[in-house]
């Protein structure tokens, strides 16, 4: 399975015989896309060919450690305070389903001076809780009248199917996204419905 669009781009370039034309800057972009789409290579990344591709990108002179720092370790104070608020006030764990939910309203985002990208990775946070294997993040969009939905899972749980069935979306097995047009209360209720529907799969060991 292809880990990301960036990996697909790399494969296409190579298929066309243009690997030698990849610049360091282009290699950095491809690596960054692969890294972010796999959560720092923590999901959708068990195919050994991914690491061969990384070795080829390294041969172009990229500094993967610096890329990681620039993406994940350059947060604003507001983002960290928002993260603390989310974990303490806006996260609900459903141990009976091995699942968790995070949600944010527009008013809450304004309170912390939200900037685009400030919530990047928030959906992954509940997955660090023991036995939680499915996490959903609902965020009222600050530009459109809709709710952005991010879904993450571990193991074989198909969050892409949940995204397609409930949130007009799709994606990878363990990383998907979608949209919801309605109120936050309605979106939360829909999430709870999908827990019931997928209970058996959520409680599987793999």
State each model region's role.
Residues 38-166, 171-206:
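Hydrophobic helix-and-loop "lid/oligomerization" segment in the mid-to-C-terminal part
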């Amino acid at each position: 399975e292809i880990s990301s669009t960036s990996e697909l781009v790399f494969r296409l370039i190579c298929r066309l015989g243009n690997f030698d034309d990849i610049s360091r800057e282009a290699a950095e972009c491809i690596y960054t896309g692969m890294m972010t789409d796999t959560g720092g290579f923590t999901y959708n990344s068990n195919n050994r060919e991914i690491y061969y591709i990384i070795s080829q990108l390294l041969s172009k002179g990229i500094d993967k450690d610096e890329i990681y720092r620039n993406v994940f370790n350059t947060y604003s104070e507001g983002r960290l305070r928002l993260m603390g608020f989310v974990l303490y006030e806006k996260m609900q764990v459903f141990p009976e389903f091995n699942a968790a939910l995070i949600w944010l309203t527009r008013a809450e985002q304004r309170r912390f001076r939200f900037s685009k990208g400030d919530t990047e990775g928030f959906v992954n946070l509940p997955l660090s809780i023991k036995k939680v294997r499915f996490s959903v993040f609902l965020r009222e969009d600050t530009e459109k009248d809709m709710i952005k939905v991010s879904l993450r899972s571990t193991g074989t749980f198909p969050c892409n199917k949940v995204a397609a069935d409930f949130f007009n979306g799709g994606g990878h097995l363990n990383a998907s996204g979608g949209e919801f047009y309605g109120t936050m209360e309605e979106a939360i209720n829909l999430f709870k419905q999908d827990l019931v529907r997928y209970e058996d799969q959520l409680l599987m060991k793999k």
